[in-house]
């Protein structure tokens, strides 16, 4: 019987059961994966120019501080004014957990998922799913997240102040 599996890209002895998430090379064992002499990532040898000046990663991906992200403007003037004049929102948006969950809400709102009957999910259903997702992260939700709760409260207060 002929084996159709790909050989280990490091030792080339047996079938490569696993795949390196950084470089994509197939490997057979943890020993091959951690072999620093044979398994080298080309990206880590040559750091990209200018990356260190713009991004600072602080301990276990808790906070990412990017000087480029601070100078961006938002789509609407009202949201941009709120963002530019709120140090609290800017500080909360540095946390990866806030960015992650807001990106998920954005994906829900901008998705083109088929719902089975009408072809595409309508905007009302997308808004409902996004609100339900946020509600699970807010106070009393099953996945309560203090940073998301604080972000939502501050943003709602600022939006209500603009409406008045």
UniProtKB/Swiss-Prot annotation:
One of its GO terms (molecular function) is zinc ion binding. GO terms for biological process: box C/D snoRNP assembly; maturation of LSU-rRNA from tricistronic rRNA transcript (SSU-rRNA, 5.8S rRNA, LSU-rRNA); snoRNA localization. It comes from the Eukaryota. GO terms for cellular component: cytoplasm; nucleus; pre-snoRNP complex. The keyword Secreted does not apply. InterPro entries: Hit1_C, Znf_HIT. A zinc finger (HIT-type) spans 8-49. Keywords: Metal-binding, Zinc, Zinc-finger. Disulfide bonds: none annotated. Zn(2+) binds at residues 8, 11, 28, 32. Present with 2730 molecules/cell in log phase SD medium. This is Protein HIT1.
């Amino acid at each position: 019987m002929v084996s159709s599996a790909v050989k280990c890209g490091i030792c080339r002895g047996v079938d490569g059961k696993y795949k390196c998430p950084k470089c994509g090379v197939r490997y057979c064992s943890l020993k091959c994966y951690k072999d620093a002499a044979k398994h080298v990532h080309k990206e880590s040898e040559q750091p990209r120019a200018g990356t260190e000046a713009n991004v600072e990663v602080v301990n276990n991906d808790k906070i990412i501080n990017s000087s480029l992200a601070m100078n961006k403007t938002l789509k609407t003037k009202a949201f941009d004014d709120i963002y530019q004049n709120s140090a609290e929102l800017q500080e909360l948006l540095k946390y990866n957990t806030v960015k992650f969950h807001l990106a998920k809400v954005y994906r829900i709102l901008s998705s083109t998922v088929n719902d089975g009957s009408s072809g595409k999910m309508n905007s009302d259903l997308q808004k409902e799913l996004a609100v339900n997702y946020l509600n699970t992260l807010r106070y009393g939700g099953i996945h309560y997240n203090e940073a998301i709760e604080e972000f939502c409260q501050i943003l709602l207060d600022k939006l209500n102040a603009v409406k008045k």
